[in-house]
């Protein structure tokens, strides 16, 4: 009988692969169809964001955050704005807080819709992406009507938001919620009980809670493993402590649980949006949307036409920028993908001394090897989809 030497087979997954979600390159070591080792190669979208921010004023740094997780841009600006507000001791008026929360939840729905529907597409269901992108298009229009940009908004500024929302826009967002919940039910009906979708996701990429903490997971990745850890509830910021919403948790920690959690979170986000819309049309119908302290937020156009001092303030804020007191602060928000944190070090000048960005996707991607070992090659794209990776924030 002849002896056969069996050696493992190496293949490249990406960077041009449609299921690689951007510019991911995985080097996979396969034993037949079984994955023995996964080696993610990142950095193909590295732009040196953290270094670039050090050469910009605090206001000029905001657009960099839109370009990290470009699926839900405003959630990242939120963390940076919170960090600057904590260092400067700025208070955001309630109408500004409600608008921020409203648009953060729109961002969460944008991200989850993209993730749930493209994950369905990765395992072969082609209808959900078409339905999901129809709703995302409407949300993009709400972004555009608030600030003029569909994606890179630069709308959340330290001190509040850039400009007020028209009443008609708030009403339109309120009218959008119920038809959207119907769409979520349709996607739910198509996928949740679907035999093929279940076979591709149940018991794939299982993470125990201990492993989730050890790998530095956050967001849906820990909630899928059974911990009710959500920064909106555990470390409330803005007016989340006044709003009612539930935190869904899974019990198996597999791809299917994470999918179910994202579906429920979209419904909870719609519930939060409903509360914000009611208050923006009710007790917070009129009022300032950004801090009235003129040292950070530029004066209104009308004031500039009347007062020389306002004009000087405006000129100084947009040329030199404001000086932030020396100190360091960590501000984190519950972004759609997990805990998005900004560690900001100020040396008292008009530019950040250091701005460290803690992207959730980075911690999730490092566990690809741990998650995919022993699974089949076809499951790699299912695991990758359930991690919800966007390369802007991983490579930054």
From Swiss-Prot:
Q: Which keywords accompany this UniProt record? A: Cell inner membrane, Cell membrane, Membrane, NAD, Quinone, Translocase, Transport, Ubiquinone
Chief location category? membrane
E.C. designation(s): 7.1.1.-
A single GO CC term, please?
plasma membrane
Q: Which reaction does it catalyse?
A: a quinone + NADH + 5 H(+)(in) = a quinol + NAD(+) + 4 H(+)(out)
SUPFAM superfamilies referenced in this protein's UniProt entry, alphabetically: HydB/Nqo4-like
Q: Which GO terms describe its molecular function?
A: NAD binding; NADH:ubiquinone reductase (non-electrogenic) activity; quinone binding
At the top level, the lineage of the source is Bacteria
**Membrane topology classification:** Peripheral membrane protein
Could you confirm whether the keyword Cell inner membrane appears in this record? yes
Task: Spell out the InterPro entries in the cross-references.
Answer: NADH_Q_OxRdtase_suD, NADH_UbQ_OxRdtase_49kDa_CS, NDH1_su_D/H, NiFe-Hase_large
Q: Where in the cell is it found?
A: Cell inner membrane
EC class: translocase
Q: Name one Pfam family in it.
A: Complex1_49kDa
> Subunit structure, per the record?
NDH-1 is composed of 14 different subunits. Subunits NuoB, C, D, E, F, and G constitute the peripheral sector of the complex.
Cited function:
NDH-1 shuttles electrons from NADH, via FMN and iron-sulfur (Fe-S) centers, to quinones in the respiratory chain. The immediate electron acceptor for the enzyme in this species is believed to be ubiquinone. Couples the redox reaction to proton translocation (for every two electrons transferred, four hydrogen ions are translocated across the cytoplasmic membrane), and thus conserves the redox energy in a proton gradient.
Identify its protein family. Belongs to the complex I 49 kDa subunit family.
- By what name is this protein known? NADH-quinone oxidoreductase subunit D 1
Question: Species lineage, top-down?
Answer: Bacteria, Pseudomonadati, Pseudomonadota, Alphaproteobacteria, Hyphomicrobiales
- Gene name, Swiss-Prot/TrEMBL: nuoD1
